[in-house]
Amino acid sequence: MEYRIVRNGLVREVERGRVTHTDVCDAHPELLRAARNVGRPTKEVCPICDDGRLVTVTFVFGAKLPPGGRCPGTVAELKALCRRPEPVLCYEVEVCAACAWHHLMRKYPAGGETKAAAKNLGKSPSKGPVR
C-alpha cells in the first residue's frame, strides 16, 4: 500500500474542511513521547499546523518483544532488531509533536533472515537509506 497517497488525500480533506484538525491530530501520548525523545528528524514541516517539524518514529513488533512493540532510539538499535532470527514487522510513523498529527508512512517485514529484511533494513519511505 502506498501510504503517502493516502496521507496526501487526508491532508487535502483537512484543507477542504471535510475533516477537522481534531480528527487527525490525535496521536496517543506514548507516540508523542517517542516522537519527542527518539524520533528521527525530517526536513518536512507538518502539513496540518505548518509549525512543527515532522519526525519519524519506528515501532518494531514480533515474537519475544513486548506486547506494545519496541521503539528503537537509534538506527543501530533498529538494525539490531531487524537482524533478529525471529521475523518482525516494522512500522514507520511520521509525527508532529506540536499538533499531534501522525500518519503511518511505511510498514515492512524484517528479521527472520528474509530477503525483505536485507532489502528494507534502514531505508526511509522516500529518502533512501537511514543514516
Residue ranges and their predicted role:
Residues C90-A98:
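Helix-rich interaction surfaces within compact, conserved domain-sized segments
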Residues M1-V88, W101-R131:
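N-terminal pre-domain and mature-chain start segments
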